[in-house]
């Protein structure tokens, strides 16, 4: 008798352009497990610095490895010309994350091409990109919006990180490094929150089919991550996850919700029930709620709640906090976080972009894809 095979979901994270490649480097540095990393760029020199196992320099003929010159059309053509190579690299993936910095050349133009290929191959495709600061100029902003719109059409779910929100986070005494580090954690934990659900066994398992059921063709989505320690930790973490500390956005009206509670082996049934009930109350009454736990003793006393809410009406996620949350009052703390920490992806109007978080892409003055590189990813 042939023994049963153990099939694991194949998850690939693709960084394209300066910002995307640096995002991938950061995830590798932080030890994100259970995924395959790919780095794609028109800048051959920058690509040499990548820690990804798979590297692909695109546009060799058109850019001679010197970058896209902040021209999305050059980035798009470079990716199109390498379509066969990209398809071969993505083949076999069950889920593909595409990350980039919007507004420049390679990431803006190439990300939709990669997402289209991944989706055509049947992979659940999630985009994670940054929107530039307003002070980076109207041209860059317009290019970013066009790139986001194109990527939205190519992805199942799109997460957009609005850099302007960094200017509104916390008091003016918060250091630049702490602000960027906080945004960095949102990006990393967002991807990790999804992948851990699939790759890490829990007492209540969420498998890839559950994740796909919520995120496939989701369009507008809201992703929240909250963590807390001490008394009422699970409830606090859940409240943070479903209320944006920065934007007072809520998941009210979501038709599909994916929820994960991660904690040590002392995670109690009562506190799990409290957290799950809060999320259930915040969603649409008829929402499809998929719930799972991850036991991770390295968290110690900390409980981490990840919520992905999707299937909103045309007007997008609501902005009313749940249970009188002090949403807008939370400030960015130093990286040496205290007992309570929080991060959340921000929703926007459906007309502009589907799903949002707090993130960054600074550096002005360069004329190439380096402008795509989020400052918190720079070393």
From Swiss-Prot:
GO biological process: division septum assembly; FtsZ-dependent cytokinesis; protein polymerization
Domain of life (superkingdom): Bacteria
Major localization class: cytoplasm
Protein location: Cytoplasm
Keywords for the protein's UniProt record, in alphabetical order: Cell cycle, Cell division, Cytoplasm, GTP-binding, Nucleotide-binding, Septation
Any one GO MF annotation of this record: GTPase activity
Keyword Cell division: yes
InterPro entries linked to this entry: Cell_div_FtsZ, Cell_div_FtsZ_CS, FtsZ/CetZ, FtsZ_C, Tub_FtsZ_C, Tubulin/FtsZ-like_C, Tubulin/FtsZ_2-layer-sand-dom, Tubulin/FtsZ_GTPase_sf
Gene Ontology CC: cell division site; cytoplasm
List of residues binding GTP: 18-22, 105-107, 136, 140, 184
Coiled-coil ranges per UniProt: none
Pfam families: FtsZ_C (PF12327), Tubulin (PF00091)
Keyword RNA-binding applies: no
Function noted in UniProt: Essential cell division protein that forms a contractile ring structure (Z ring) at the future cell division site. The regulation of the ring assembly controls the timing and the location of cell division. One of the functions of the FtsZ ring is to recruit other cell division proteins to the septum to produce a new cell wall between the dividing cells. Binds GTP and shows GTPase activity.
NCBIfam families for this protein: ftsZ (TIGR00065)
Homology family: Belongs to the FtsZ family.
Assembly description: Homodimer. Polymerizes to form a dynamic ring structure in a strictly GTP-dependent manner. Interacts directly with several other division proteins.
Protein name: Cell division protein FtsZ
Organism: Mycobacterium leprae (strain TN)
